[in-house]
Each structure stands twice: as structure tokens, then as C-alpha cells.
Amino acid sequence: MTTPPLELATRLAATVESQHYTLYERGDECSIGLDAVMQVVIEPDGTVRRSDATLGPASSPCAGVAQALAGIPFEGWRAYGRADFELAHLLHGLGGSQGSRPLLTLSIPRAEIRLRPGQALLRALDSTDLDDLQARVVAQDAASEPAAGQPVQIGVDTHAGEEHLYKQHVAAALAEMHAHAYQKVILSRTVEAPADLDMVASYLAGRRCNTPARSFLLRDGDFQAYGFSPETVVEIDALGRVSTQPLAGTSALCGDSAENERLRRELLADPKEIAEHAVSVKLALQEMASICSPDSLGVSEFMEVSCRGSVQHLASRVSGRLASGRDAWSAFETLFPAVTASGIPKREALDSIRRHEPAPRGLYSGCVLLVDSDGAMDAALVLRAVYRHGERCWLQAGAGLVPSSTPEREWTETCEKLASVACHLRRRPLPDAAD
């Protein structure tokens, strides 16, 4: 393989006939799961189903998922999945979603491609699929730029939307915090994007100018999404080592290094941003303490500044080792949703979000994840993302509110976060009229 993994993966995503795939970038690996030979889902009412089997009772939806995965009849499987934000309502006793879409879906792919620099691992359940995969990978590795030309940049006004209404909701949430209803909440808003958006080209353009912890591109029938996750909800390896990566506290980045350094120093000294970060790390420690051996728990990074595209954040990492009797799904149930996309305490923040946002979030602030047969899990927080459902395309971003917040600053923060994605949107050039 001579093509970089990310570019090769996007070429493959753009050319496969499959209407169901997930591309997941982690470190130097891009992996793609194509179609599904088996699925495990959590329904809106909390029922766990596996497409090929009847499951017994379980103590919780996540325990039911662990039970379902334990019976998968394939060796060395990898599941590709996603969880909507509203799964959190179910896990925290607020009821699930009123819709019909599953709150969590895990798919064992019919075929899989794992790309690293200079190599490709191809896996399939059928030898014919394997031959087809090999031919596709070889062809796309040798391909040049499409004759249709470069995608065209398109604009989105990140200040669009009902500014007054958003600030009104922020003010209402601040009043609730001043009355000690909760300590922190993230309120988000959406911005519409052009319907002729090219999802794959936009993903590649955005990724080239971004430095995410993870990135993803997925399609499930008429639903598509891509994103540049600034942090992970949870990372667990096969040995039971677990970590979570709260990012909270945000400042803009620009093209001037001296100005960026000034903004960095300002971020590290801003009482509001520090307070927002500190309470997030505190909750992450409390949650991790409930699933980890006490002597293993620690903060391996604290208030580092991480650059993510056109914004920078305060970042910390809380790490430990799963206690006896705990597994990846115990950790997921405890840590989902990310504190940095919900609030503190989580249950009260979830209720606030449901009251102050006009519609369910869906995948926004949920996660896209990989789960391996050896017990490993990697779940990317879905932020800095673009969504398409049918003919509608949109972006969504939120701001973290603490008692010292102001509606004006939180509106500006959503604009900054939206801009980090909006400036890289692309569509294919229109056909030449002479043709």
C-alpha cells in the first residue's frame, strides 16, 4: 500500500455500493466495517435484541449487551457501533426515546478492512467477498484524482439560527444553577447545511485540517454522519486498563502563532474555563472510582491544552484498571454520556437538556465505538460532526454552562465550534453544461 490510510479509506468509502458502513480512525489505523451479518441493539424501551438469537433477562441494558456479545459465534470479531445521546435517559432513569430508532446499535460486519501505513488487513466471512475487497483496495490504492475534479467549498453561516431563543434558554439554565439545581450543563443548537453536501469529500477536507482524538464516517441507509471527535468517552484495552478523557474549557485558535499563545495563556488563567474543567475532572474521578481498583486510579494528564481544529481545550485524562467483576460494559454504563457533553450531576443535567433544547439530540454527543472480542472498547464522543438524514443536513454544537457563564459568551462558543467544521464543507462541482 502506497496511499496513506486515511485517504485510501475515504476512497473506499466513496466507491463501495454498501448502504451500511462505518469508518473509524484511531491513531495510525483506519478500519471500515461493511454491512452487518449480525446486530445487537438497545431499543427505546430498553429491550436488548440480537438479530439471530433470543436473549435471557439481564440486570440492565448494558449487561444485556454484554450477554448478547458473549454468545457471538465468530472468533476474533470486531463490532462497529453507535449510541444516541438519548440512551443516557434510559441509563439514568429518565425513560428512553419516543422514536423507533434503536438507542444503541452494534454490527458485526460482513466484511472488514483495516488500514495502517503500508499495509491492509482484509477480513470477510465469505471468500468471494474477500476477493472483491482485495480487488477494491488494490484498485483504489493505484487510483489517481477523480476526473470530475476537486470538490467545491460551500459556506454555512454559523451565526444563523434563533440567537435570542438560544440565549433565553441559557439564561433560564443559569437561573436554575444559581438556585443550586445542578452545577453544569451543556446546551446545544443546530445550523442547517446545504443538501448537496458531499459527506465523504467534506470529511476528508475537514480531517486534513483537524487534529482529533478520533474521527469517523458512517452510513446507515438514509442516515449519514462524520465527525472529528475531540475526546473519547472511554478507552479500554484487553487487560482491563480503562481511561476517559474529559475536555472542558474552550478558546478559539487563529492563523497567528503569537495570538494563539496569548489565547492559550488566557484559557489557562480564565476562572470560568478552569471551573468548568475542574468539576468535569472531579466527576470523571468519582465515576471511575466506582468501576476501578482503588490503587489503580489516577489523573495521568491534567489541564493540558489540546488543539482541535480551530479551537483549543483544557484536557485531562483519568485512568485506572477495571475492578474484579467489572467489564467494558460496566465502564460504558458508568461513563456514558460524557460529562463534557451533558453536565453535573448527570441526571439533573439530562433533564435540563431535555427541557431547554427543542428536539432530541440523536447521535450528537452520543458516541461511535469499536468493541473487540477480547474485551477492548474504544468509544469516540460525537462532537464537531455533520449529519444527514434524507435530504436534511445539519451541524450541531454546544457550550458548557457553569454559574459564572453568560449567554453572550456561550453563544460565541457555539459559533467557534461550528466554524471548526463548517469551513471545510464541500460539494462536488456541477457537471459542465457542454457535456
Regions found by a protein language model. Name each.
Residues 48-53, 115-140, 235-309, 386-435:
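Cytosolic ligand/metal-binding cores
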Residues 26, 30-42, 102, 107-111, ...:
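An anion-binding catalytic pocket shared by soluble metabolic enzymes
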Residues 81-83, 215-218, 286, 361-369:
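A short glycine-rich, hydrophobically flanked beta-strand micro-motif that places a catalytic Asp/Glu
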Residues 1-53:
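An N-terminal JmjN-like helical accessory module and its immediate linker preceding a catalytic domain
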Residues 314-435:
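Conserved hydrophobic core element of enzyme catalytic domains
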Residues 57-193, 419-434:
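Non-catalytic accessory segments adjacent to catalytic cores
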Residues 81, 113, 180, 234, ...:
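A residue-level signal for conserved active-site and pocket-lining positions in enzyme catalytic cores
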Residues 1-5, 190, 301:
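Short amphipathic
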